[in-house]
Amino acid sequence: MCDNSCFCENKQDTIDESLDKTCIFCTIAKGDDRYTEILAEDEDFVCFRDINPGAPHHYLVIPKKHIYSCLSLYADDISLVRGMAEMGRNVLKANNVTDLKDISLGFHVPPYITVPHLHLHVLAPYSQLYKWAINKFRTNWYINEEKTVEILMKGKTQMV
């Protein structure tokens, strides 16, 4: 189990171009999935609703380039994490979420990911997680935005 403070030299490629054709999140990022409504998009990221929401508001923010997971993040990816979080907060505001202190923005740590493409969970209100989701989003296998940035700011090569 990860204690959210460890680092290792995980050799998984950050970007794997071969997955573009088979990764559902790459398909969504390209706008090629007719079943997914894009809620926000910019040059680097897209945001859409989670198909299995764990809270009244549950969105996913993904980078357009294929990045495996939070294990693939390096110290120079802090701006990527912050950009994803900013988009998530903006989507919450656009959906009339006003209490930004009762939210959670975070990543699941492999092996507890369902899609091998980096995705930031945006949950609100965090105090109203659905019963089935409580253990999924309140665990050491779920690392919030602040902790992710804190670990990356330590200047380690790669985060776990």
UniProtKB/Swiss-Prot annotation:
Main localization, broad class: cytoplasm
Subcellular location: Cytoplasm; Nucleus
Catalytic reactions of this protein: adenosine 5'-phosphoramidate + H2O = AMP + NH4(+)
Keywords on record: Cytoplasm, Hydrolase, Nucleotide-binding, Nucleus
Listed Gene3D superfamilies: HIT-like
Segments forming domain HIT: 24-132
UniProt-recorded name of the protein: Adenosine 5'-monophosphoramidase HINT3
Chain sites annotated for binding AMP: D50, I51, H119, L120, H121
Listed PROSITE patterns: HIT_2
Family: Belongs to the HINT family.
